[in-house]
């Protein structure tokens, strides 16, 4: 093997092919193996190379790599909006309609409808490509309506959604058997795509069928999924909530003051806290949401100020503080001693400094930067519990993407 020795001992197990395997490179590996004396012939060397990558024979490995190369060429044609090339390739080799391409490997049609490369609204060429594929062998339902699920992530793809539904795509389908199509625009917080699905018959209260079987609350309805999602934009969140409520959407987070903060309804929040001043420091144990920024921390046991900090609602935060909310109120601490974070832990650990404005508000109102708590850590390390200050948490999770928030905390004398 060029550049170093390659073990072909079967005892070391197989290795995965490179992401973009090259047949010429594999042939060179076999030749190098033959020259090294580790194989008795070129055929023996090719067999050893095939087995190294988990294939029963060289012809099987060769056929697999050639198919991947052809799939790569098809993707290039799609990305270039080269309708003629796509037609030629798929007509010559119809199985390409089912090639493992696109999100979830659902197929070329899924990749076409997502309009990711180039990132733009579906052009006439892209729409023509999708329609030709559907009428010549591509399954509009591939992967559980994967094409519609990916198109529904963005409102400017509505022309593609219209085409798919016209050809039988189901707005109430379950992508891969468990993810309602309506969850897609909830994840991306796209009110236009969400409203289009609802106007075309999507059920706002459709649930993951595995949820009922397991008797668990997550992910719940579309409104539950929206509120519990990781994306952050107060404007877009509020718009999507309004669309779902108008369509009869239900949520387990149906607590008036919480929804007032999430919807950006300051008038309603002011009315509620005026009628019941104790709301500003009440803790809400039912809030199993608020996970973002690559962290596992939730809002359970937090106050309305924690909610405002988590979702970046500066105006709501200011109103709550003016009404007597404790800027250093701690969330509930469980029997294991986990919890007790103040609102600033939520605002200081958002992606891309999203929480910077409300972090500044909390600091100006006296947020304690020395408080140290034990709380859930990184999303990639389930079960991790970290002991930290607000600055320590921001450094742990935000990295360079939290540069301005970290700098602000340091300006105010924060300690790790």
Q: Model regions: which residues?
A:
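Residues within HEAT/ARM-like alpha-solenoid scaffolds
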Residues: 103-104, 121-128, 155, 159, ...
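Ankyrin-repeat-protein effector appendages
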Residues: 66-76, 200, 227-275, 356, ...
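Structural detector for tandem alpha-solenoid helical repeats, activating at a conserved register
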Residues: 84, 128, 159, 192, ...
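Ankyrin repeat domain, specifically the short helix-to-loop turn at the C-terminus of the second helix
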Residues: 90-96, 127-139, 162-170, 195-204, ...
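Ankyrin-repeat intra-repeat helix-capping/turn positions
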Residues: 81, 125, 155-156, 189, ...
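Ankyrin-repeat boundary/"N-cap" motif
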Residues: 69-76, 98-118, 141-153, 174-187, ...
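Alpha-solenoid repeat scaffolds
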Residues: 68, 96-97, 103, 115, ...
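Intrinsically disordered, low-complexity eukaryotic regions enriched in glycine, serine
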Residues: 2-88, 92, 111
């Amino acid at each position: 093997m060029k550049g170093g020795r390659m073990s072909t001992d079967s005892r070391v197990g197989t290795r995965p092919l490179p992401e973009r395997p090259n047949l010429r490179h594999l042939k060179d590996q076999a030749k190098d193996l033959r020259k090294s004396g580790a194989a008795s012939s070129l055929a023996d060397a090719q067999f050893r190379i095939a087995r190294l990558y988990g294939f029963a024979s060289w012809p099987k490995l060769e056929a697999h790599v050639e198919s991947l190369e052809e799939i790569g060429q098809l993707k290039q044609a799609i990305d270039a909006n080269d309708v003629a090339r796509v037609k030629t390739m798929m007509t010559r080799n119809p199985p390409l309609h089912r090639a493992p391409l696109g999100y979830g490997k659902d197929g070329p049609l899924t990749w076409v409808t997502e309009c990711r490369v180039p990132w733009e609204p579906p052009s006439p060429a892209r729409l023509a490509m999708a329609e030709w594929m559907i009428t010549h062998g591509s399954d509009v339902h591939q992967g559980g309506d994967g094409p519609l699920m990916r198109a529904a992530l963005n409102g400017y793809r509505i022309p593609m959604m219209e085409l798919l539904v016209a050809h039988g795509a189901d707005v109430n389908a379950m992508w891969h058997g468990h993810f309602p199509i309506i969850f897609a625009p909830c994840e991306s917080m796209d009110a236009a795509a969400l409203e289009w699905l609802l106007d075309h018959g999507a059920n706002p209260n459709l649930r993951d069928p595995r949820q009922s079987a397991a008797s668990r609350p997550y992910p719940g309805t579309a409104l539950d999924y929206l509120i519990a999602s990781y994306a952050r934009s107060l404007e877009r969140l509020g718009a999507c909530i309004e669309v779902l409520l108008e369509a009869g959407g239900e949520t387990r987070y149906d607590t008036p003051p919480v929804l007032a903060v999430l919807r950006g309804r300051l008038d309603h929040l002011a009315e509620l806290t005026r009628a019941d001043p104790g709301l500003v420091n009440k803790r809400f144990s039912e809030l199993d949401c608020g996970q973002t920024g690559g962290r596992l921390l939730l809002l359970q046991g937090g106050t309305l100020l924690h909610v405002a900090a988590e979702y970046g609602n500066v105006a709501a935060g200011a109103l709550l503080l003016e009404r007597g909310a404790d800027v250093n109120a701690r969330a509930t601490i469980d029997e294991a001693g986990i919890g007790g974070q103040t609102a600033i832990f939520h605002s200081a650990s958002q992606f891309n400094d999203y929480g910077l404005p409300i972090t500044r508000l909390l600091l100006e109102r006296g947020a304690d930067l020395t408080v140290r708590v034990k709380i859930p850590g990184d999303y990639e390390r389930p079960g991790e519990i970290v002991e930290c200050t607000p600055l320590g948490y921001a450094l742990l999770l935000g990295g360079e993407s939290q540069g301005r928030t970290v700098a602000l905390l340091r300006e105010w004398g924060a300690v790790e």
